């Protein structure tokens, strides 16, 4: 069988094997540390802080929040419709509709609607920077340490949590603290193989 497979492959009758995709996990805080983190986050009155809070409430990827545009938002229906072209591994014609909780709608209503992007950047940039959300997490971590707290570390990797790690935090919370089937959290995270 091995020789037959080699002959078929070498002769061009079999497609090349797919490369193995190794997932690189992003540092995430423990889900029971999130309430303390939110206390620090809610004290901040900056666009990146509101963007990070919105990301936590919607469980979106940081880049989806960074590039969220006003035409994708329907405040009356309480939805954010993300085109597949902006999502990881999605068909460009596919849509992902995110239901918005009241606080997420409140955040959106507080943002200026004068530009293309929901979360505008500083110094004339159209959208917040790629690092804005992560820098906010790092600043909150430092603020916690300065006030005698333990900060917001990923215990497995011994690294400061990052914005993308909020998705893992949600996944862990859903598994540990709810009775929902795993597929519900997977669909919330817009994972394709759900």
Predicted regions and their residues:
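Basic, Lys/Arg- and aromatic-enriched nucleic-acid-binding interface segment
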Residues: 2-68, 76, 94, 126, ...
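Substrate-binding beta-hairpin/strand module that engages nucleic acids
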Residues: 3, 7, 186-194
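Catalytic-site neighborhood detector that most strongly recognizes the C-terminal catalytic loop/helix
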Residues: 19-20, 28, 84-89, 105, ...
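Short, basic (Lys/Arg/His-rich) helix/loop patches that form interaction surfaces
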Residues: 39-49, 110-117, 122-125, 134-187, ...
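Basic, alpha-helical nucleic-acid-contacting "clamp/cap" segments
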Residues: 31-44, 75-140
């Amino acid at each position: 069988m091995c020789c037959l497979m080699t002959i078929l492959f070498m002769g061009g009758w079999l497609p090349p094997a797919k490369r193995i995709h190794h997932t690189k996990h992003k540092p995430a805080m423990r889900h029971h540390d999130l309430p303390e983190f939110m206390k620090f986050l809610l004290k901040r009155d900056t666009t990146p802080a509101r963007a990070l809070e919105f990301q936590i409430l919607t469980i979106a990827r940081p880049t989806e929040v960074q590039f969220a545009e006003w035409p994708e938002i329907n405040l009356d229906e309480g939805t954010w419709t993300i085109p597949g072209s902006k999502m990881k591994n999605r068909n460009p014609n596919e849509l992902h509709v995110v239901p918005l909780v009241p606080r997420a709608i409140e955040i959106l209503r507080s943002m200026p609607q004068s530009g293309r992007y929901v979360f505008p950047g500083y110094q004339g940039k159209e959208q917040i920077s790629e690092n804005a959300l992560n820098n906010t997490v790092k600043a909150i971590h430092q603020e916690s340490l300065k006030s005698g707290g333990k900060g917001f570390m990923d215990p497995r990797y011994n690294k400061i949590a990052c914005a993308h790690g909020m998705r893992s935090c949600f996944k862990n919370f859903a598994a540990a603290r709810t009775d929902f089937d795993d597929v519900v959290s997977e669909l919330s995270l817009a994972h394709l193989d759900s």
